[in-house]
Regions:
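Surface-exposed extracellular loop regions of Gram-negative outer-membrane beta-barrel proteins
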Residues: 1-28, 46-74, 163-172, 206-220
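Outer-membrane beta-barrel domain signature
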Residues: 17-21, 76-80, 100, 129-133, ...
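Surface-exposed loop and edge beta-strand positions of immunoglobulin-like domains
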Residues: 21-23, 33, 47, 80, ...
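Residues that define the transmembrane beta-barrel architecture of outer-membrane proteins
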Residues: 24-28, 81-87, 138-142, 181-185, ...
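Repeated loop/turn-to-beta-strand initiation elements of outer-membrane beta-barrel proteins
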Residues: 38-42, 98-100, 152-156, 195-201
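Gram-negative outer-membrane beta-barrel transporters
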Residues: 48-50, 69-166
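C-terminal beta-signal and adjacent terminal beta-strands/loops
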Residues: 52, 105, 161-169, 190-241
Length: 241
């Protein structure tokens, strides 16, 4: 018997699916790396994935269960098969090639492009839809970090980006839920000293851009949920005996 979770405050129900098939993935990766004489490397790669019977949450409205009607019904289902092809790039290097004094300063960055397409889509009423992206697969992902490391002092400024992607699939494209694109920026600092009792003072500030958690339904102008958390600051001291 499948699990049943009822959220009465929102009149929502989630039911498990004992008929789920395991997801199977066939992967191919090819990459090339070049290492600089000083610390650092540049890397480029391509990949291909064939995924069979991927699982995604299907959402329906006005669902009846044991005499009650729920406004939102969620159940995981095998949605079909998918093909993913993409490119991965990464670069890491300190700045000593500019001047020896800049050896303590460096940069690290990655970028991933993924093109995904669903085949044999088997949601009832949507079998003939084409050009669907695989749920949970953003097209663009990028990360970058600028750092300073000298002695016990470490400073780092980081940036992360991911484009929007399908999170849940509904009865039609109108009801598909998307996780909106995100831009995160964080800064971290720490200083470590001592030999017998190694002590580290640290501080960090996350979400400097006040990036919200946002979902939209169908099209970007139809906000489904938006939550702002502001900047989170954390500081402290660690002592190793």
């Amino acid at each position: 018997m499948p699990s049943v979770n009822i959220k009465r405050s929102d009149n929502e129900i989630t039911i498990g699916n004992p008929e789920l098939k395991p997801t199977v993935s066939y992967n191919f990766d090819l990459s090339a790396d070049y290492y600089f004489r000083s610390i650092g490397l540049i890397s480029a790669g391509i990949f291909y994935k064939k995924i069979d019977d991927f699982i995604v949450d299907q959402v329906s409205t006005n669902y009846e269960y044991q005499g009650n009607t729920y406004t939102r019904f969620t159940q995981p289902k095998n949605a079909g098969n998918a093909n993913l092809v993409g490119v991965e790039l990464s670069y890491q290097r300190d700045f000593s090639f500019i001047a020896p004094a800049l050896k303590c300063v460096g940069f690290y960055g990655t970028y991933t492009y993924t093109h995904s397409r669903v085949e044999d889509f088997n949601f009832e009423g949507r079998e003939n839809e084409k050009d669907l992206s695989m749920p949970g697969s953003p097209e663009h992902i990028a990360n970058a970090s600028l750092y300073f490391e000298k002695g016990g002092l470490n400073l780092r400024l980081s940036y992360n980006f991911a484009s929007d992607f399908i999170d849940e699939m509904g009865e039609s494209t109108f009801y598909d839920r998307y996780y909106d694109k995100v831009n995160y920026m964080d800064v971290n600092a720490s200083y470590t000293f001592g030999k017998k009792f190694k002590t580290t003072f640290y501080a960090e500030a996350n979400n400097l851009l006040n990036q919200p958690l946002r979902y939209y339904q169908g099209t970007k102008d139809r906000t489904m949920q938006a939550e702002y958390y502001g900047v989170k600051v954390n500081a402290g001291v660690k002592i190793n005996f």
